[in-house]
Every structure is written in structure tokens, then in C-alpha cells.
Amino acid sequence: MKGKVAQKRAAASPSGVGEVIRVMPAVVDVEFPHGGVPEVLGALESELEYAGEKLVLEVAQHLGDRMVRCVAMGSTDSLSRGDKFISTGNQMMAPVGRGTLGRVFDVLGRPIDGLGSVSSDVEFRPIHAKAPSLSEQRVAAEVLVTGIKVVDLLAPYLKGGKVGLFGGAGVGKTVLIMELISNVARAHKGFSVFAGVGERTREGNDLYREMVESGVISRDEPSKSQAVLVYGQMNEPPGARMRVALTALTMAEYFRDSEGQDVLFFVDNVFRFTQSGSEVSALLGRIPSAVGYQPTLAAEMGAMQERITSTNTGSITSVQAIYVPADDLTDPAPAASFAHLDSTTVLSRQISELGIYPAVDPLESTSQALSPEVVGSEHYEVAQEVKRILQTYKSLQDIIAILGMDELSQEDKLLVARARKIQRFLSQPFHVAEVFTGHPGSFVSLEDTVRSFKGLVEGQYDDLPEAAFYMVGGIDDAVKKAASLK
């Protein structure tokens, strides 16, 4: 069932009928006749419909000879002892293929966008898969150009890498995500898959509508869309929230392995993936480990994260929103994620209050790719000089606030002027925000980004006014804007 072996749901033949003997919230015990006990991770489907849909269970444990304990993917409120469940003979399956583009799915791959069933050319694959073997993985470190200056210069993303996206509400996280989706489609002809794990229904709805408005998703012609959305919403049982990321990842793997795409895979929020696993673990009766988390935390996180990688055919680059409980970075849940990250993109409220978007903090954001071996010596040196200038400006701000600019040396005054220009030049008009800002969007190539900032730090543009650097693409746009300001 792995790789290019696709299966239709209809092909799954029942291999046994079991009877419900115990119902708990989100967990169900089912008894099967001898010889008909399904495997662990096998999917069971109810004979009856509950609230208009069949209930799906996933086998989590074998209890004795004939009994299995299962995790429910839907509400168990209407379930009764004696209800029948059929073993499908398969794991839970996810729809894959171009027919999924522009659609919104739940954890079971059922469309929830009101646009009817998916096209008949969609295949179904099991959501549990092994990570690519060492021989299948591409080891060459290659930068994924996003077209966003601040990211490409100071915290570049690796193809097949994992990026942690840190940011509170209202600092532009959604717009940044949509621009990344749009730019990857534009520059790499790649698709994006978004997994809403424990997502608020309102936020998920807002994201979908904004994607439709910006053209990332086309409701009239879904095949022209650039993204797939998969939601396991906050009101759903922990089983659905725990598995929705794997459903979305299976869709992303298809685009990588079968179509050779460079895929962007978004997870919002990784903490909720861990949290739902903790809930399920407690319901299954496992003894918790530190701080109440499941004893299998590291294994569950690793099983998902190791599937996100570059192969010889394509890549999956993951951008993962991470909530840090009580700002405690030593908490086991975020700590388990940090071990897998290659880059961090930190969105700052202080920068957004200055009106600089994207509000990426250039000093807090980091990347393993920012080394001479990966990006080249010129890019590395320019990035380090930009950071040095911004850091010095930050340290001088208290002096400026108390004593004023006049008390600075000529050298410091020049450095502050360059820092303010760099700060504004890190802003950029986005394609997906054209409707709101009135500025045409700009995709800046990596070569143009490095050339532009190199000229800035070397003082080639000291004569241009600060305003010329705000909300432009490359340095040529800044020069044109400066001419228009005169």
C-alpha cells in the first residue's frame, strides 16, 4: 500500500464484523469473532450512520484475544453497546492527486467545503507510511527561494527543511503563509498543503475565504488552485486532531513522490498535535511522562517529522506554527519540535507596530542554512553585516531616546541612518495583500536581494531618503521611488 500503489476506498473488503461492548468519550472497545481481529492502526467503519455520517474508528490496542480498543474520529455521543463495526482491512485512507486542489477536507478525506464530492481521478492512500529511506533522500543542502527578502537573506529555508513560525495574533502570520503559498506556486510551480490541527473553526474559515479572495484557491475552477486545506477543528475529538496532520502529509507526499513537486506543508499548530496525542494517551490508560504528556511523545513527533524531507524526486518544506505554553521553551511539547527545526521565523509585534510588513524579526529569526557552505560567502557576509548594523542600532536606541541623535558620533549617525534604511527595506509589498495595500506585489530573486543589501551596507545608497526604501521590491524599485519623491 506504499508508494505509487493507489487504492480506491471501494476496494477495501470487510474482513470482520465486531460489536461495541464499551463506550467512553473518544475511545471505544469492540469485540470481534475469533480470526477476525483487525491489526493495530486498522480502520473500522460503523454499519449505521450517526448524525448523517458513518463513524470511523482506528485500532489503537489489542485487549486479550478478541477485543480491540479504538480511537474515534468523530463524536461517540450516539453510540450504543451492541452497535456493529466492520473492519475495512485497511488503515485510514486519504485522497491524493490533483483532484484535491482547491478543496477543504476533514481527517477522513471527506470534503467539507460544500462543493460536492471530489473528482473520480483521485486515489486513496494509507495515512501511516514510513519515512523515505537513506538511499531515497537527497542530502544536498539547497535553499528554497521564497521571494521574500527578509527570509531569503537572513533566515533562508532549506528545501525539505522544517521551519518554526512563531508569532502572536494580528502580526501577519496568515498573510505571510498565503504569500509563501503564492510564491512557491509562481516560482517553483509547486503546490501547498495546509493542515489545521486543533484550528478554531472561525480562523479556518477566515483562512479559506482569504485564500479565495487572493486567488490562491479558485472555487469556480478548483484545478487551477495552488493549495489543499485539511482541518481537524478544535471542537472535534482528539483522535481527529491527532491524525489530521498525517492526512495532510499523505497528500503532500503524493505531490512530492508522484509529481516531483517542491511542496510547502503548513501545520498550525504543532502544539495541538501533541496536545491531542496526550488526550488520547490518557484515554487509552497509558502512564503519563513528564508534565503529563504521553510517554510516546518523541516517537509520535519523530514519525511525522521524518516524513517531511527532500527525496530524489522532490521535496516537502514544512512551515510549522508553534505555540509555547507559558513561554516555557523547556516544556516537553515545544522542545520535542525544536529538535527537528532547521529554521525559525519570528514575527514581532514591535516591528508590526512600526508598519513594517512582513513583521519578521531579523535578529531573532535563525537558520542552519545561513552558512558560507550553503548560501555562499558573499550572501553570508552581507547577511552578517546587516545583522551587525541592526544590532548596533538596537543598542543605540536608548541613548537616542534619552540624549537625541546629536550626541552620537559621526560614525554612529551614519550607521543609524543605514540601519533605518535597512529596516524599511526589509518591508515588502505582497501579491496576496495587493487588494488591501494598493501596492503591487513583488517577488525578489535571491541574486537581487543579496545585491541590493550589499549596496546598502556599503553605503552606495546613503544619498537616498528613508521613504524610498519602504514597501518596495529590489533596490532598483527604491531608486525609482526616490526619483519620484524629489
Swiss-Prot record:
Reaction it catalyzes: ATP + H2O + 4 H(+)(in) = ADP + phosphate + 5 H(+)(out)
Gene Ontology cellular component terms for the protein in this record: plasma membrane; proton-transporting ATP synthase complex
SUPFAM superfamilies registered for this protein in UniProt: C-terminal domain of alpha and beta subunits of F1 ATP synthase, N-terminal domain of alpha and beta subunits of F1 ATP synthase, P-loop containing nucleoside triphosphate hydrolases
UniProt xrefs under Pfam families: ATP-synt_ab, ATP-synt_ab_N, ATP-synt_VA_C
Principal location: membrane
Localization: Cell inner membrane
Record: residues binding ATP: 167-174
Keyword ATP-binding tagged: yes
EC number(s) reported in the record: 7.1.2.2
GO molecular function: ATP binding; ATP hydrolysis activity; proton-transporting ATP synthase activity, rotational mechanism
Bilayer topology: Peripheral membrane protein
Keywords recorded for this protein, A-Z: ATP synthesis, ATP-binding, Cell inner membrane, Cell membrane, CF(1), Hydrogen ion transport, Ion transport, Membrane, Nucleotide-binding, Translocase, Transport
Top-level lineage group: Bacteria
Quaternary structure annotation from Swiss-Prot or TrEMBL: F-type ATPases have 2 components, CF(1) - the catalytic core - and CF(0) - the membrane proton channel. CF(1) has five subunits: alpha(3), beta(3), gamma(1), delta(1), epsilon(1). CF(0) has three main subunits: a(1), b(2) and c(9-12). The alpha and beta chains form an alternating ring which encloses part of the gamma chain. CF(1) is attached to CF(0) by a central stalk formed by the gamma and epsilon chains, while a peripheral stalk is formed by the delta and b chains.
UniProt family annotation: Belongs to the ATPase alpha/beta chains family.
Role, per record: Produces ATP from ADP in the presence of a proton gradient across the membrane. The catalytic sites are hosted primarily by the beta subunits.
Protein name stated in the entry: ATP synthase subunit beta
Provenance organism: Anaplasma marginale (strain St. Maries)
Lineage of origin: Bacteria, Pseudomonadati, Pseudomonadota, Alphaproteobacteria, Rickettsiales
Gene field: atpD
